[in-house]
């Protein structure tokens, strides 16, 4: 389906120069006395490379439909992460470059959404928050509680975040996947 470039938003998939691309960001610009244009940050799904492209606001682009599949993270195999569809038991091997920062929040059997455009994996969507175990946290020093003092803690995935002083090793904490910050005890 062809639509105006100005109607395309973040998270949608388009076909650009024959390649399937995921829209990472869109900006509408109207410089001085020039025509308005739409600037998009796109990621080519075949190469994994991101680039910036400009379109006139009336230019037509081919919009692709995204299919969402609920899967579970299974294991890591070299530089790939393997996800499984719990209904069909199909597995999907995803390169580390595509997983990106999401790897800091993945643990075995973690539910995630895989987005497909024309049977090509487009993106990985994590839940808003995940529950992870603290594997290393230094003890808080007595008298440090005058204000909201935080200390570093290492989680089971290797992610290091700031947590309140009362969090101890072995506890479960709720972490925001968008900001990578401590939310609460689990």
UniProtKB/Swiss-Prot annotation:
Q: Which biological processes are named by the entry's GO terms?
A: peptide biosynthetic process
Principal localisation: cytoplasm
Cell location? Cytoplasm
The entry's cellular-component GO terms read: cytoplasm
Q: Which UniProt keywords apply?
A: Cytoplasm, Elongation factor, Protein biosynthesis
Pathway, per record: Protein biosynthesis; polypeptide chain elongation
Entry function: Involved in peptide bond synthesis. Stimulates efficient translation and peptide-bond synthesis on native or reconstituted 70S ribosomes in vitro. Probably functions indirectly by altering the affinity of the ribosome for aminoacyl-tRNA, thus increasing their reactivity as acceptors for peptidyl transferase.
Question: What is this protein called in UniProt?
Answer: Elongation factor P
Protein species of origin: Methylacidiphilum infernorum (isolate V4)
Q: Which gene encodes it?
A: efp
């Amino acid at each position: 389906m062809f639509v105006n470039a100005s109607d395309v938003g973040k998270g949608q998939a388009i076909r650009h120069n024959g390649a399937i691309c995921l829209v990472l960001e869109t900006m509408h610009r109207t410089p001085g006395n020039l025509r308005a244009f739409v600037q998009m940050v796109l990621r080519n799904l075949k190469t994994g490379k991101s680039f910036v492209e400009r379109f006139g606001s009336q230019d037509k682009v081919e919009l692709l439909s995204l299919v969402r599949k609920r899967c579970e993270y299974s294991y890591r195999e070299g530089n790939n992460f393997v996800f499984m569809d719990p209904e069909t038991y199909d597995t999907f091997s995803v390169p580390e470059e595509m997983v990106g920062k999401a790897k800091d929040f993945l643990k075995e059997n973690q539910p995630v959404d895989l987005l497909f455009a024309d049977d090509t994996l487009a993106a990985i969507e994590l839940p808003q928050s995940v529950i992870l175990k603290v594997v290393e946290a230094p003890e808080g020093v007595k008298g440090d509680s005058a204000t909201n003092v935080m200390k570093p803690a290492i989680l089971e995935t290797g992610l290091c975040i700031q947590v309140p002083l009362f969090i101890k090793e072995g506890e479960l904490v709720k972490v925001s996947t968008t900001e990578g910050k401590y939310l609460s005890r689990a």
